[in-house]
């Protein structure tokens, strides 16, 4: 699978910038912090970030917009939280303001999530926060650091910063912090490719499978680092294996019935879907990693531009 490459993205100095795909406009400065860098991770503007900072570096903000190809706000917020906890320089920060839902500008439901952490004995960072919400087909993530704000003030500051964005009209479902699944998935002792004839391996193999949809997701397990398994609450035959905190994930789901049943594996990125060999039964997460490491992709389909 492709590595995430960073490219400096041109932006109008001192001018607002509009994300062409979503219509979101980001000002040249957020709460008087000037834009200092813009980065593109996947063209054309499928995964971008912009950084804002005070001259002395005591306050900083990062806005990231990445394509919504899978999961939900609770899923990708949980990944963003874990990314903070895994940062060695933050020294296992304490959750100071628990995960709270908020209503993004122009939306009617509390469809966004935010949280604030308080690093201990970390020079230059008194509080660090994250907020995430969805605008149509795009996730919007805010990261904020401050050397002066206490956690409760950081929480309010983030909402104030988000209010400075110009967002297109739209709606999104209410969000709630993700919870652990009631029971963990039970995987077979061995994993193997499906032995069905190639003609029967269509959905999710020859072509990308349909998106796994669910009004409510739960956390099945953290595999390691910021790799975690989520699934529709109550489902036992499918899951999403999130890799990192920017939208990349493996989607595993069943197809067919009885003797013709198999499980597809799709690796979802910002602009395409890679299909891996069909599996005879529900594969454990390590099987996905092994197949990806062995570069056993059988097909790739572009998902951008959308049909």
PLM features: what roles do these ranges have?
Residues 231-307:
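Extended, charged low-complexity segments
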Residues 71-101:
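Mid-length scaffold segments of soluble, non-membrane domains
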Residues 142-193, 288-301:
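Surface-exposed amphipathic alpha-helical segments
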Residues 32-36, 45-50, 107-118:
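Short, hydrophobic/aromatic-rich segments at coil-to-beta transitions
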Residues 48-80, 200-203, 210-211, 220-256, ...:
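A short acidic-to-branched-hydrophobic micro-motif
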Residues 45-49, 60, 123-129:
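Short, surface-exposed coil-to-beta transition loops
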Residues 61-64, 137-147:
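Short, well-ordered beta-strand elements
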Residues 91-132:
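Signature of long, low-cysteine stretches enriched in small and polar/charged residues
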């Amino acid at each position: 699978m492709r590595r995430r490459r960073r490219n400096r993205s041109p932006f109008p100095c001192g001018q607002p910038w509009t994300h062409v795909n979503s219509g979101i406009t980001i000002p040249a400065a957020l709460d008087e912090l000037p834009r200092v860098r813009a980065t593109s991770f996947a063209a054309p503007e499928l995964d971008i970030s912009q950084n804002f900072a005070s001259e002395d570096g005591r306050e900083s903000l990062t806005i990231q917009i990445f394509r919504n190809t899978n999961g939900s706000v609770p899923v990708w917020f949980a990944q963003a939280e874990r990314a903070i906890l895994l940062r060695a320089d933050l020294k296992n920060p304490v959750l100071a303001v628990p995960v709270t839902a908020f209503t993004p500008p122009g939306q009617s439901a509390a469809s966004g999530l935010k949280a604030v952490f308080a690093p201990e004995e970390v020079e230059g960072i008194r509080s660090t926060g994250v907020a995430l919400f969805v605008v149509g087909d795009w996730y919007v993530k805010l990261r904020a650091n401050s050397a002066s704000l206490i956690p409760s003030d950081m929480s309010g500051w983030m909402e104030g910063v988000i209010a400075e964005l110009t967002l297109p009209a739209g709606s999104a479902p209410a969000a709630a912090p993700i919870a652990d699944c009631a029971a963990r998935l039970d995987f077979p002792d061995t994993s193997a490719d499906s032995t069905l004839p190639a003609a029967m391996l269509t959905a999710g193999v020859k072509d990308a499978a349909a998106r796994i949809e669910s009004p409510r997701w739960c956390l099945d397990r953290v595999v390691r680092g910021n790799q975690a398994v989520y699934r529709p609450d109550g489902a036992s035959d499918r899951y999403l294996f999130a890799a990192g905190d920017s939208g990349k994930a493996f989607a595993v789901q069943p197809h067919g019935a009885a003797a013709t049943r198999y499980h597809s594996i799709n690796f979802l990125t910002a602009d395409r879907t890679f299909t891996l060999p069909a599996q005879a039964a529900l594969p454990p997460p390590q099987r996905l990693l092994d197949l990806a490491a062995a570069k056993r992709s059988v097909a790739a389909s572009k998902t951008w531009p959308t049909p």
